[in-house]
């Protein structure tokens, strides 16, 4: 059994950003046109009038101020409100592969590794571009990595589940090092005409190098002390888009073919589950919550993160204890907690302990205990 470390992280950020004000302007233009087009039916009570949104509402509900996106114009067009992403030929690298390459190159550089040092690729994300061939095998080919690759989807927890899979492979000697990447085009499955959720998601890609400790040489190493995962079935976060939709044409275009959630139920049910999993994980490793210097939590909602930290610590978290990146990135699904790790790790002293945690649809929750080398 080999000791395992994270030796490098990377981040790909799209060039385009949308502020709350821009998003609200587009949404309200759609609402005004809808209400005007349906004025007679609304007056008769046959159609419910839509309600405008505001930047203040979005920030109060989520803590989000802006988000990065792969396409801005298509989202902000009130007549479209969907990103415009052109199809590519089968001979071109796909857009998820392109994002993964950008994040992977930074992770490899921070780890001091090349493609020749990597034996496997795991693409772990919520929104895979296609059923097959696996996006991971495409990334593997694009980077010139020998070995194997596969895709996995555990929604917003995909990164922590991917980290456990990568850790197991390296521990058991099945690979010297694994590249785990999380390319997320969340805006592709978001209903920008839904007032309660149109502001939630952004796009990004993260990458992590997991390797044998005795082969690691970078200045950015974290021992992977332990991993713990849990799932519990729930319909409160769901997306029913899939290849079987064409076999049931009556459902094509229905709202459940995009992201839908029961937000209040998710908040009420998931927060205590996350706090309990992390607390039990620490106890199993003879650690106290007070031993943890940093919590890199899934970046879905500021109020959720504040509550989880409060449940764990018994008080409000200090600014550096549970860093927030969702104000500028929004919810990037599986990439969020890794963005927090990537941007808030270099200041930690040797020996400092941290917890990387994700939570989302499934329900699925992951906890990874890390120790700075």
Question: Could you tell me what each predicted segment is?
Answer:
Residues 1-93, 194-268, 276, 372-373:
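Condensing-enzyme catalytic core mediating Claisen C-C bond formation in acyl metabolism
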Residues 7, 124, 153, 178-184, ...:
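Short beta-strand segments
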Residues 6, 50, 54-154, 282-305:
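Conserved beta-ketoacyl condensing-enzyme motif
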Residues 182-183, 190, 232-239, 301-302, ...:
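Acyl-CoA/ACP chain-elongation machinery
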Residues 17-18, 132-135, 163-164, 189-195, ...:
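Short acidic, glycine/serine/threonine-rich loops at helix termini
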Residues 97, 101, 108, 127-128, ...:
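Claisen-condensing/thiolase-fold acyl-transfer catalytic domains that form or cleave C-C bonds
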Residues 174-205:
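Flexible, glycine-rich active-site loops centered on histidine and acidic residues
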């Amino acid at each position: 059994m080999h000791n395992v470390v994270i030796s490098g992280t990377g981040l790909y950020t799209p060039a385009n950003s949308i502020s709350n004000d821009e998003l609200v302007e587009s949404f309200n233009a759609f609402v005004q046109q809808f209400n005007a087009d349906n004025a007679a039916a609304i007056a008769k009570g046959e159609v419910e009038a839509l309600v405008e949104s505001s930047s203040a509402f979005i920030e109060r509900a989520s803590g989000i101020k802006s988000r990065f996106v792969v396409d801005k114009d298509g989202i902000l067009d009130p007549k479209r409100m969907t990103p415009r992403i052109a199809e590519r030929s089968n001979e071109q690298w796909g857009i998820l592969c392109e994002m993964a390459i950008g994040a992977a190159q930074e992770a490899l550089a921070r780890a001091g590794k090349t493609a020749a040092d990597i034996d496997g690729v795991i693409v772990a994300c919520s929104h895979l571009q296609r059923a097959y061939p696996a996006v991971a095998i495409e990334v593997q080919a694009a980077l010139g990595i020998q070995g194997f690759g596969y895709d996995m989807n555990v929604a917003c927890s995909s990164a922590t589940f991917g980290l456990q899979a990568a850790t197991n492979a390296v521990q058991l000697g099945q690979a010297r090092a694994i590249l785990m990447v999380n390319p997320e085009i969340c805006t592709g499955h978001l209903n920008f005409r839904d007032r309660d959720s149109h502001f939630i998601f952004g796009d990004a890609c993260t990458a992590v190098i997991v390797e044998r400790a005795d082969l690691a040489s970078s200045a950015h190493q974290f021992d992977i002390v332990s991993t713990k995962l849990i799932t519990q079935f729930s319909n409160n976060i769901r997306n029913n888009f899939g290849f079987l939709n064409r076999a049931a044409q009556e459902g094509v275009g229905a709202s459940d073919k995009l992201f839908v959630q029961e937000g209040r139920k998710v908040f009420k049910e998931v927060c205590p589950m996350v706090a309990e999993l992390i607390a039990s994980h620490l106890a199993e490793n003879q650690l106290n919550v007070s031993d943890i210097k940093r919590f890199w939590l899934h970046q879905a909602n500021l109020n959720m993160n504040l509550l989880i930290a409060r449940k764990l610590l018994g008080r409000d978290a200090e600014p550096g204890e549970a860093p927030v990146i969702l104000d500028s990135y929004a919810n990037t699904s599986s990439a969020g907690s890794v963005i927090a790790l990537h941007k808030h790790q270099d200041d930690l002293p040797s020996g400092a302990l941290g917890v990387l945690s994700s939570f989302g649809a499934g329900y699925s929750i992951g906890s990874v205990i890390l120790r700075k080398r």
